[in-house]
Amino acid sequence: MIDSTSTATATSKTVELNTNGSKTDASSENGTASNYPEGLWCFDEAMKMDPETTVKLQLDHLNKLRTVHGHARNFVKADNSRFVDEKGTEHLDLIGGVGVVTVGNNNQYVWDCLQKCFDAKLYMMGAISYRNLAAAFGRNMALLSPGQKLTRTWTATGGAEANEGVIKLIRLATRYKPNKKKFLSTLNSFHGKTTGAVFLGGKEKWQKYQSPAPFDVDYVPYGDAEALQVALSSGMYRSFIVEPIQGEGGVIVPPPGYLAKARELCTKYDTYLVLDEIQTGCGRTGKFWACEYENIIPDCIAFAKGFSGGLIPFAGYIATEELWNAAYNSLETAFLHTATYQENTLGLAAGVATIDYIVQNDLLSRCRKLGGIMFDRLNKLQTKFPHVMKDVRGRGMIVGIEFYPIPESVQEEFGEYYATPIVNDLADTYHVQVYCSLNNPSVFRFLPPLTIPEADLDEGLSAVESAVAKFDAKVKEAVAAKST
């Protein structure tokens, strides 16, 4: 029987910690760690690490080129829609971890639910055990699914892993259909950066050095129903995977009726319809799933980001009973796709708590309201600077501004697009965080927490207005100087 009041030890030796965090074997002759290198950081010391050491060690041991633009920050605290850096400066979060912190940074309710798991010393691992949180999360996802028809849930730790799971699901489900040989996706799409996911994505930039693709895949223009019909009519495609809104592609919203037409065509040509709702799900657009705006029922939805409140890596997919059974309803295939952290208790707890918080606080309605405020302000800004801002688009609280190229005569000084220098100025001068889209550097995005106070949203939008006006004046001045 486990004594919950005691702590098990691997050996009878006493292990102490130096003040620098390295482990010392007190039973060794010279008092130094014989089994461990010197200089290891313990948790308490790591939490007290000074900013200079933090920067040095991160540049030494992680990907230093990710900070090459010089705008990385040492954020030490986050609460709802605010960050605090090591100097005590507050920063406003209008990107929300690219849609991760749907319920705000460090949501207290989700934290409390996770703490209850720790306090209860719950069993954390094992996808083959029965657990109440797994049952609750699966049931909730089924009830929240379009038409309550996607009743099977598979969980993972990130969006790319979720889409890798989708790839295997579809391949297994179509294994007895010899004419189904390929996947179909859209140009400029993004589905993650693991080897399979980058080839689902229709951007060659992320496929570099990864060829050959591990499966056959073709791409059609996003939002083009006619091109989709031509492709699907060949009868060769296992599935069509599509984002309801292309997030990394530049917050591209397809024409009305596009998803409904995709559903119709996939049914007609015996092709599974998979929606990647990793950026648009969990209430981001004002409905729980973006596809609900067209009242369609896909065969599978990939989810991630906002489903754990940003506190635990958590993702997965939901699928119809028919699709799931075609893939996994036999002992031969049931264990062909498992993962160490599949149905991890903390991920499930965060998922249940996040959904609960969204429902109890009606964040879908709040998203639609605040999204309306964002569009109203940004559309008015576009009318003031029509030569700078090409478009404002999105839905709910996933919003993008597309900018025109900077005049060629001053591109050497400022870069190709207005978006990047404005994003940098927002971070440096106004302490407001937004990001450019990975696949479209002419666009920067807003995905703020759905819990952001209206005052914070107003402050952030005012900063955007000021930054756009300031940079427009700077570019005009530079162009005028060049022409004289």
From Swiss-Prot:
Matches recorded under InterPro entries: Aminotrans_3 (IPR005814), Aminotrans_3_PPA_site (IPR049704), Class-III_PLP-dep_AT (IPR050103), PyrdxlP-dep_Trfase (IPR015424), PyrdxlP-dep_Trfase_major (IPR015421), PyrdxlP-dep_Trfase_small (IPR015422)
Record GO terms (molecular function): identical protein binding; pyridoxal phosphate binding; transaminase activity
Compositional bias segments (type: Low complexity): 1-14
Protein name as catalogued: Uncharacterized aminotransferase C27F1.05c
Enzyme class: transferase
Enzyme Commission code: 2.6.1.-
Region of interest called Disordered, as start-end residue ranges on this chain: 1-32
Organismal lineage: Eukaryota, Fungi, Dikarya, Ascomycota, Taphrinomycotina
The protein's required cofactors: pyridoxal 5'-phosphate
Pfam families: Aminotran_3
Biased segments, Polar residues type: 15-32
Residues bearing PTM N6-(pyridoxal phosphate)lysine: K305
Protein origin, superkingdom: Eukaryota
Alphabetical keyword list: Aminotransferase, Pyridoxal phosphate, Transferase
